Curated annotation (Swiss-Prot):
Binds 2 magnesium ions per subunit. The active site is at H108. The gene is ilvC. This is Ketol-acid reductoisomerase (NADP(+)). Mg(2+) 1 binds at D191, E195. It is an enzyme of class 1 (oxidoreductase). Pathway: Amino-acid biosynthesis; L-isoleucine biosynthesis; L-isoleucine from 2-oxobutanoate: step 2/4; Amino-acid biosynthesis; L-valine biosynthesis; L-valine from pyruvate: step 2/4.
Length: 340
């Protein structure tokens, strides 16, 4: 059974006299820094000199300094920059300040799980991973609630690593909802698997393949877009609110019957075998090795994949149709922009 922890099991006073450095001020960094500060903790934000976020931190009324300065001042250092780049950042700016008794924290276990960051033996290494994007972590906290989080300890040099991580989660507001104990390996492997098989890779490939099937059969691309892309949100929202059962309660009996009869034809034993292989590649480190090498080589395949999908007909049609629907709050990525 999962171990769950709540507000009454976390002691925020453990961190009252432990300066905290938040490294990065993106989606999660912004939320962590502001929530912890509002919880009465001593927070500073570490950024590269000249970072575009420097002024934003100052506008938020928080202390801002270089990464190295923040790491030196802090007892707890939370790294909230993109996975690729963390190892170099750690080696050059954080590692020199990690004296025995300090804590190194993460919100995702990639660099610890795959050996890109190897902390010294004398420090605590833990993780607090809110299960929501940063803006939602902040929004729910301000409303008096919290989002669930995962918590893990990789290295407990002081004997209090878990209790400190739990207190940190309380500072974010996460123990108001509930915090689930896990391990760095479990969080990392399941997170990558979910992204690849369902949330990003699986859904994207399914949507494109279904769209292409309809268009090749002679149906209008606009109609195919509505059926295969646009309406997906309606179903996902039902999943989000009440799971598979609530979705099936909410759709027509015809749709539910098609769910039962057609779904297994899409997710076949061959599909499941591919899922198992993807998981094996994650567990063995093959995926991480490939991704790290891709970045070292300047991302040629990554950029080619991205450009190919930008030019896919479903994206061309989608841009036009979303202009008809201002109520969906359309967004467009400008050339050269990309995710973290």
């Amino acid at each position: 059974m999962a171990e769950l922890y709540y507000d009454n099991q976390a002691d925020l006073n453990r961190l009252k006299h432990k300066p905290i450095a938040i490294i990065g001020f993106g989606s999660q960094g912004h939320a962590h820094a502001r929530n912890l500060a509002d919880s009465g903790l001593d927070v500073r934000v570490g950024l590269y000199p000249g970072s575009k976020s420097w002024a934003k931190v100052e506008e938020a009324g928080l202390k801002v300094m270089t990464v190295a300065e923040a790491a030196r001042e802090a007892q707890i250092v939370m790294i909230l920059t993109p996975d690729i780049g963390q190892a170099e950042l750690y080696r050059e700016h954080i590692a020199p300040a990690m004296e025995p008794g300090k804590t190194l924290m993460f919100a995702h276990g990639f660099n610890i799980r795959f050996g890109q960051i190897v902390p010294p033996a004398g420090i605590d290494v833990s993780m607090v991973a809110p299960k929501a994007p940063g803006h939602r972590v902040r929004e729910v906290f301000v409303q008096g609630g919290g989002v669930p989080a995962l918590i893990a300890v990789e290295q407990d040099a002081t004997g209090g690593a878990f209790e400190d991580a739990l207190a940190y989660a309380k500072g974010l507001g996460c123990t108001r909802a509930g915090v689930l104990r896990t391990t760095f390996a479990e969080e990392t492997e399941t997170d990558l698997f979910g992204e690849q098989v369902v949330l990003c890779g699986g859904v994207s490939a399914l949507v494109k393949a279904a769209f292409e099937t309809l268009v090749e059969a002679g149906y209008q691309p606009e109609v195919a877009y509505f059926e295969c892309m646009h309406e997906l949100k309606l179903i996902v929202d039902l999943f989000y609110q009440g799971g598979l059962n609530y979705m099936r309660y909410s759709v027509s009996d015809t749709a539910e019957w098609g769910d039962y009869t057609a779904g297994p034809k899409i997710i076949t034993e061959q599909t499941r075998a591919a899922m198992r292989q993807i998981l094996a590649d994650i567990q063995s480190g093959a995926f991480a090795e490939d991704w790290i090498e891709e970045n070292h080589n300047g991302r040629p395949r990554f950029n080619a994949y991205r450009q190919a999908d930008i030019n896919h007909p479903i994206e061309q049609i989608g841009r036009e149709l979303r202009r008809m629907m201002p109520f969906v709050n359309p967004r467009e990525v400008k050339p050269g922009e990309g995710g973290a």
